[in-house]
Amino acid sequence: MESAVSEPGLLEAIWRDFVLGVVQGLTEFLPISSTAHLKIVPVLAGWGDPGVSVTAVIQLGSIVAVIAYFRADLAAVLRGISGAVRRGQWREPEARLGIAMTIGTLPILFAGLAIKLYWPGYETSPLRSVPAIAGVSILMALLLALAERFGPRSKQLDQVQGRDGLLVGLAQVLALIPGVSRSGSTLTASLFDSWKRPDAARFSFLLGIPAITIAGLVELKDAFTEPSAGGVLPLMVGIVSAAVVSWLAIDWLLKFLQRHSTWVFVIYRLLFGILLLAWWAGSGSN
């Protein structure tokens, strides 16, 4: 059973939100699940559930970072779509990327809306329990291992088609299950879909921008109904730390995958899931 946690003071709230911002920034874009880590880290630190008001607002940092990092790509996509509308040049790489991003965003939008409308108990469902998150982490590690082992890795971003957006977009829906990882599911699907590792990661990030932004804004409205300890200052610290670390994580992963495989993430997710199960079994927590 979880014990009651007292409301933190200002300095503790600043430290908590700073750490949560770092965790958010690291885990949002690395294929290791931000939801899992944002659930587990506060429990291990003895902070309890930080609440929607904290996690939703801090996520703004990651949204700002990913849009800023890929601003040139997004501008090129907008120019490509605009040119295609005016001149019918839908076969240009930028236009095809825009189409793929649009198609790939629709499945998670519909699935997320369906959950909001028809599954009121989602936030407290067994899917969000520690053993479920641990099991999902292990399963996703195995799927990523298979994709790494058997994916042909020949496709580049300028070859993207609408079907790629649909395939990876359907995989993105799995991110609604805590512990899956949005970037993990889309990266895994892209590797199965024959993408080269750096292009798979880049497409995963670009495809995720609409979903991350919309989800963040939807959750943000709940922040105004939940007062946060310490007021605005801790949240601002969390936003800034999330933005900085998100930028660094995106940049690092794109460079890392130029020369390395995803096996390090497979191993991490396996260990994370196993250790999480061991901790849960030993503590008797839910």
From Swiss-Prot:
Belongs to the UppP family. GO terms for molecular function: undecaprenyl-diphosphatase activity. It catalyses: di-trans,octa-cis-undecaprenyl diphosphate + H2O = di-trans,octa-cis-undecaprenyl phosphate + phosphate + H(+). Its main location: membrane. The chain crosses the membrane at residues 50-70, 97-117, 127-147, 165-185, 200-220, 230-250, 262-282. It is found in: Cell inner membrane. One of its GO terms (biological process) is peptidoglycan biosynthetic process. The keyword Transmembrane helix applies. The lineage of its organism: Bacteria, Bacillati, Cyanobacteriota, Cyanophyceae, Synechococcales. Bacitracin is thought to be involved in the inhibition of peptidoglycan synthesis by sequestering undecaprenyl diphosphate, thereby reducing the pool of lipid carrier available. It comes from Synechococcus sp. (strain WH7803). Its EC number is 3.6.1.27. The keyword Membrane applies. InterPro entries: UppP. This is Undecaprenyl-diphosphatase. Catalyzes the dephosphorylation of undecaprenyl diphosphate (UPP). Confers resistance to bacitracin. The gene is uppP. Keywords: Antibiotic resistance, Cell inner membrane, Cell membrane, Cell shape, Cell wall biogenesis/degradation, Hydrolase, Membrane, Peptidoglycan synthesis, Transmembrane, Transmembrane helix. GO terms for cellular component: plasma membrane. It is a multi-pass membrane protein.
